[in-house]
Amino acid sequence: MFLKVLMLKQDDPRKCSAAKLVKFGLAKPVTRTASRTLILNPFSKKILLKSDKKLVNSITGIDCSWNLVTSAFQKTFSGISRKLPPLLAGNPMNYSKLNKLSTVEALAAAVYIMGDSALTHILLKKFKWGHTFFELNKNLLEDYSKAKSESEILEICHEYGLEAI
């Protein structure tokens, strides 16, 4: 799966996980989104499913500050918008906070759910805390990757005692 990042440059560039992915050639920086890309949008009404893979040729992470996330996503982006199911952050800024993922965590989760666990590990290896994100979420990610519908995702959330999304 081809990865892209739309960097809104709202964070400290030294701590920006999207910039690091670009630096290592793991994601391409873009200035606008394409129609056949999957947009990771925490405000989307639809949850990401493995079956979404056949609809797109890339995944785009919108890199923005969590403090400005509402205004960042008021803009409309071309592409297919999906939100991730609930996951715990493994990054030092938001450790164990539900759904407060860094861009790399969001992209890694999306590619795992869509069936590319090898790419997930490649992405996370670039960060000291990458393994922490995976350890916190490995069972969830595995279950989410097997879900065939949003109702199955909601069942999984209920089984793990996670708040409804």
Descriptions of predicted regions:
Residues 14-102, 113-140:
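Active-site cofactor/cluster-binding pocket
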Residues 1-11, 37-40:
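Short hydrophobic beta-strand segments
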